[in-house]
Amino acid sequence: MAKQKIRIRLKAYDHRVIDQSAEKIVETAKRSGADVSGPIPLPTEKSVYTIIRAVHKYKDSREQFEQRTHKRLIDIVNPTPKTVDALMGLNLPSGVDIEIKL
């Protein structure tokens, strides 16, 4: 018989918020009796944008901005119905994107 697994991917711009959310999820799953592996840090995406500072000319004067997307992966093996109910009722902070695969 195949084991049932829930895979949760978290994405956020702030690493502190994503780590707090991951700890809440892991703590909730362990309290309900499921096996948890993670949080596993995935590679951080870095997007760099270059913008000309001046409005009309002075192309040599530029400014660069970057946006980092932090990601974490959590696997919950053999979840119980109690685990699923606890995860559905969990309040996580805004700014965290959650993808759940069964």
Curated annotation (Swiss-Prot):
Q: Which GO terms describe its molecular function?
A: structural constituent of ribosome; tRNA binding
Q: Which UniProt keywords apply?
A: Ribonucleoprotein, Ribosomal protein
**UniProt cross-references to PROSITE patterns, sorted A to Z:** RIBOSOMAL_S10
The record's Gene Ontology cellular component field reads:
ribonucleoprotein complex; ribosome
A single GO BP term for this record reads: translation
**Is Glycoprotein among the key words of this record?**
no
Identify the InterPro entries for this entry.
Ribosomal_uS10, Ribosomal_uS10_CS, Ribosomal_uS10_dom, Ribosomal_uS10_dom_sf
Leader sequence residues: none
Assigned protein family: Belongs to the universal ribosomal protein uS10 family.
Subunit structure comment from the entry: Part of the 30S ribosomal subunit.
Checking PANTHER family in the record gives: 30S RIBOSOMAL PROTEIN S10 FAMILY MEMBER
- What function does the entry list? Involved in the binding of tRNA to the ribosomes.
Q: What is this protein called?
A: Small ribosomal subunit protein uS10
Q: What is the protein's species of origin?
A: Staphylococcus aureus (strain JH9)
What is the organism lineage in this UniProt record?
Answer: Bacteria, Bacillati, Bacillota, Bacilli, Bacillales
